[in-house]
Amino acid sequence: MNLPVATALFTPSWHAELELAYARFGDCTRPTRRRHLGPLRVQKHLYAEGPEVCQHIIVHPPGGIAGGDRLDISARVAQGAWAQITSPGAAKWYRAAGPAYQSLNLHVADGATLEWLPQETIVYSAAQAELTTSIELEGDARLFYWDVVALGRPASGERFDLGHFQAHLDIRRDGRLLWHERQRIVGADGLLDSPIGLDGHPVFATLLVTGEIDAELLERCRSLGHEVRGDLTQLPGLLVARCLASEALLARAWLIDLWRLLRPALLGREALPPRIWNT
């Protein structure tokens, strides 16, 4: 039974923190810090691609984020190290009488690589989700970052009619701003159906990867994704890809297809999808 928002939430809020750090020792990347507070954890680090790439899976045992919750996540990748961070499933932001927050701070040192590849974020109608992401790159640090956001639950016939989704994202290299983005989508906003907004698509995705590709590879990337509305833009030192989709699975499949093409070209390694994506 669906209860009114004002009476639905009597559960206590969570304040969770996760602090990660990675360093290179010889030809191996190892985690050097895994501090957690509250219900945020990482599973045992994996080396599916060999010792150079350290993979971590972030888990949030409560299964979702409700009003008053606050998640603070930070990761630092030291010189020469390579970290790949993903998640086992969707992050769910539940309907709430008040806002919930996530702060993400990533720092990638000169010569280091970070792949931030979480699964989708589902924002239920009447949720109040506020996310802030700050990424600092040094020298020739490399970044592969994506996010997928689903508003409402279209498979269940739930539109995003109440609440809001707010996201701030800044990327800097040596203190210089590379990317600055502010999003705020309010339930039942006209932009949800407007041709200059989401045009009726409940799902949108963004990919940001450092580096530049040639025109031939750019066209190959643009030829992907017949089930989504997607495109790419090459900026100086940063490739941007965006799509609109009817389902999160379609958007995520498009991102993975791009990753398969772009990872060898920009990071010098073939793309090996984490096994957790198949579970």
UniProtKB/Swiss-Prot annotation:
Pfam families tied to this protein: UreD
Main localization category: cytoplasm
MF-aspect GO terms: nickel cation binding
Chain segments annotated as coiled-coil in the UniProt record: none
InterPro entries given in the database record: UreD (IPR002669)
Family listed: Belongs to the UreD family.
Function: Required for maturation of urease via the functional incorporation of the urease nickel metallocenter.
Protein's recorded name: Urease accessory protein UreD
